[in-house]
Amino acid sequence: MAQARTEFSKVAAPRKLEEMYAQRGDLFPYLLAVLVLLTLVSVFHVWSRVRVVDLNLEVAEVARQLKVAQEEQNRLKLEVASLKTPARIEAVAKGELGMALPTDQQVVVVK
């Protein structure tokens, strides 16, 4: 195989400033696009973290409200159970409503 010869004796001429600026100008839109993209990703990341914190606070508040509601439900169940006792019903019937147990003359047996 034949190998190509390379000449290293030639020195590249220094580029002119205008050419360097032109080359930089070609990269500027890409760098700007990358910078904008990184900014958008950063803003989205911060927004999502703030949203997660807000949702965690909301979950904690709802959990607290649920606990309060369950305690209220248990208290109301106990109150209903105490109001349903036969002794209390009889006391309310006699005291507040003026009711009494019927006498033998007030009882009618139907055959």
Swiss-Prot record:
Keywords: Cell cycle, Cell division, Cell inner membrane, Cell membrane, Coiled coil, Membrane, Transmembrane, Transmembrane helix
This protein's record includes keyword Cell membrane: yes
Predominant subcellular localization, coarse grouping: membrane
Positions on the Periplasmic side per record topology: 48-111
Coiled-coil segments: 51-85
Compartments where found: Cell inner membrane
Membrane topology: Single-pass type II membrane protein
Keyword Cell membrane applies: yes
GO annotation (BP), single: cell division
Transmembrane segments: 27-47
Cytoplasmic side: 1-26
One GO CC term on file: plasma membrane
Pfam families cross-referenced by the UniProt entry: DivIC (PF04977)
Described purpose of this protein according to its UniProt entry: Essential cell division protein.
Family stated for the protein in its record: Belongs to the FtsL family.
Cited HAMAP family: FtsL
Name of this protein: Cell division protein FtsL
Source organism: Geobacter sulfurreducens (strain ATCC 51573 / DSM 12127 / PCA)
